[in-house]
């Protein structure tokens, strides 16, 4: 189904560009908004996003624009691919223009000073809008290069889910639906932290046993924390949980993995982030997640360990020693350990 109105994608980064391309390939007219006029002009003239998705052709149906007010006025379905640190600042002045719109967040992050997810910020800014999120094992370059990919659109608004599925579903991109918006979005935000740790472990040439342990214990931590906040634990067995965690913790294409790998090579955190040239949400998420887990008294030793390395001056060897000496816990939470 093709939308009668153009569809907006807010954000000129790699993921926003990949989603804009998918929409255009499905016959949609797309307005991709970005703040930088030079970037918009480069995409318009070269049909490529050289800053964030070099070598991938941008579909002719994608119109790069810089007039946000007009874009919001012209479009009903709006995909929001703005960094977590910028989303509120960009959209708050346009609150009135968002009434009755369908807003779908693509950003996997948490606002630093409030611990709010992006969909919660959208609800605050535009309480009359209809809100959804997209999350899953979705590396932007692989989507843009038409590798077979699946994602999850999550909302209690079934019509919104159906419209997003119709707009994005194609020969290489499959869209599943979920009603657990909170769990889907939280999984996408939390796994960024563990991807940094996975990159660090890879740079230190740790064995496959170790990497497998990190990923599975990360899943246990994520789920434990999310359930404490009201999410459905089953969500974390799907694409937005274990699926996203595996790809982000295994692929050098992941921005957060790259930051961790750079740290393992001996770079400082500032140098590692600077090398990226694009937002790695996991660094910001780690700070607020450590504070929130302490406040809620949720057991998250991997989060505490990575925080100690990045912000407390501990070495990886010191943290590993502490982790391995920790009290053994139950392997799988949420399943009774009796009666089997």
UniProtKB/Swiss-Prot annotation:
Gene Ontology molecular function: glycerol-3-phosphate dehydrogenase [NAD(P)+] activity; NAD binding
Source species taxonomy: Bacteria, Pseudomonadati, Pseudomonadota, Gammaproteobacteria, Pseudomonadales
Enzyme Commission number, as recorded: 1.1.1.94
Residues at the active site: 191
Catalytic reaction(s) noted: sn-glycerol 3-phosphate + NAD(+) = dihydroxyacetone phosphate + NADH + H(+); sn-glycerol 3-phosphate + NADP(+) = dihydroxyacetone phosphate + NADPH + H(+)
Physiological role: Catalyzes the reduction of the glycolytic intermediate dihydroxyacetone phosphate (DHAP) to sn-glycerol 3-phosphate (G3P), the key precursor for phospholipid synthesis.
Gene: gpsA
BP GO annotations: carbohydrate metabolic process; glycerol-3-phosphate biosynthetic process; glycerol-3-phosphate catabolic process; glycerol-3-phosphate metabolic process; glycerophospholipid biosynthetic process
Compartment(s) where it occurs, according to its Swiss-Prot or TrEMBL record: Cytoplasm
Residues reported in the UniProt entry to bind NADPH: 14-15, 35, 108, 140, 255, 281
Main location (coarse class): cytoplasm
Protein name: Glycerol-3-phosphate dehydrogenase [NAD(P)+]
Organism per entry: Pseudomonas aeruginosa (strain ATCC 15692 / DSM 22644 / CIP 104116 / JCM 14847 / LMG 12228 / 1C / PRS 101 / PAO1)
Keyword line: Cytoplasm, Lipid biosynthesis, Lipid metabolism, NAD, NADP, Nucleotide-binding, Oxidoreductase, Phospholipid biosynthesis, Phospholipid metabolism
Cross-referenced Pfam families: NAD_Gly3P_dh_C (PF07479), NAD_Gly3P_dh_N (PF01210)
GO cellular component, one term: cytosol
């Amino acid at each position: 189904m093709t939308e009668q109105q153009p569809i907006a994608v807010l954000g000129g980064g790699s993921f926003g560009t990949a989603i804009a391309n998918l929409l255009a390939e499905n016959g949609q007219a797309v307005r991709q908004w970005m703040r930088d006029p030079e970037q918009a002009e480069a995409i318009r003239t070269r049909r490529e996003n050289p800053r964030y998705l070099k070598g991938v052709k941008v579909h002719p149906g994608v119109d790069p624009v810089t007039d946000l007010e007009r874009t919001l006025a012209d479009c009903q379905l709006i995909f929001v691919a703005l960094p977590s640190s910028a989303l509120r600042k960009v959209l708050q002045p346009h609150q009135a223009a968002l009434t009755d719109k369908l807003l779908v967040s693509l950003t996997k992050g948490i606002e630093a000073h409030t611990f709010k997810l992006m969909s919660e910020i959208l609800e605050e800014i535009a309480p009359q809008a209809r809100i959804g999120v997209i999350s899953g094992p979705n590396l932007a370059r692989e989507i843009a290069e038409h590798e077979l990919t699946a994602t999850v659109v999550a909302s209690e608004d079934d019509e919104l889910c159906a419209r997003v599925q119709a707009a994005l579903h194609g020969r290489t991109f499959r869209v599943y639906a979920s009603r657990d918006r909170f769990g889907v979005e939280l999984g996408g935000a939390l796994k960024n932290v563990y991807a940094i740790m996975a990159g660090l472990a890879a740079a230190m040439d740790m064995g496959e046993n170790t990497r497998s342990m990190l990923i599975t214990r990360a899943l246990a931590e994520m789920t434990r924390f999310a359930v404490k906040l009201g999410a459905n634990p089953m969500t974390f067995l799907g694409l937005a949980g274990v699926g996203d965690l595996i790809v982000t913790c295994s692929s050098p294409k992941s921005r957060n993995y790259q930051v961790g790998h750079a740290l393992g090579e001996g770079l400082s955190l500032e140098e590692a982030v600077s090398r990226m040239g694009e937002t790695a949400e996991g660094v910001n998420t780690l700070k607020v997640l450590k504070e929130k887990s302490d406040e809620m008294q949720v057991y998250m030793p991997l989060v505490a360990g990575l925080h100690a390395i990045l912000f407390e001056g501990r070495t990886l060897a010191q943290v590993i020693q502490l982790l391995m000496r920790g009290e053994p816990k139950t392997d799988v939470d949420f399943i009774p350990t009796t009666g089997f």
